[in-house]
């Protein structure tokens, strides 16, 4: 392949060369590492074999960010780009279901809305079971410890299952607040309003910390018709006033519970977690 590139350069051909390789079970490029070092860009084509969409993710890029992704859907005419991944990820979201919260994460410069699902039920064993799909398992355990210590939810006797709908994987801290709300909503069996979206990092003291690019996240939520956006209070200044969507700033997890559940769909609009 190196010789092929030299030929193109000598003949003045201004074209790109694609080298197709395979990956190991660990998800790394197979064969000698020189294959990865000699190219300008390495792209991984990811996706669950049972899902209709695929994600094109850059892991090396000498000419730009590696945090950008492309979302494609397999149709009868072949792979087609999904122009609005947020709308695609939220399709099929159940209405008025407890344990379901919409959060916003960033993939590079692209805001993506996603549904975070949680199921909390009484454990029948001495050691409660915890499962996380699409989210770091240790992060979920950390956030549940915050809920138990700072909010007072007795989760040590409950099994908990947390999932990002659609099969994508997200490790950005901005989804912390969504995980917290989904677990609390499932524990109380009370749904959060359909028009509410949350984002923010959660610290061990229960504080809600700022995340990057809050303006883009709020703009994406407004574009998809959300009416309430719960954000870190320190981000309110950079977001400013946004017409058509109510932006609420919170300092702590406890404050988030009270504010978010004011907008719950049922059974009563002013019920709070305690």
Q: Which sequence ranges carry the predicted segments?
A:
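Positively charged, low-complexity/disordered segments
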Residues: 1-8, 266-269, 273-274
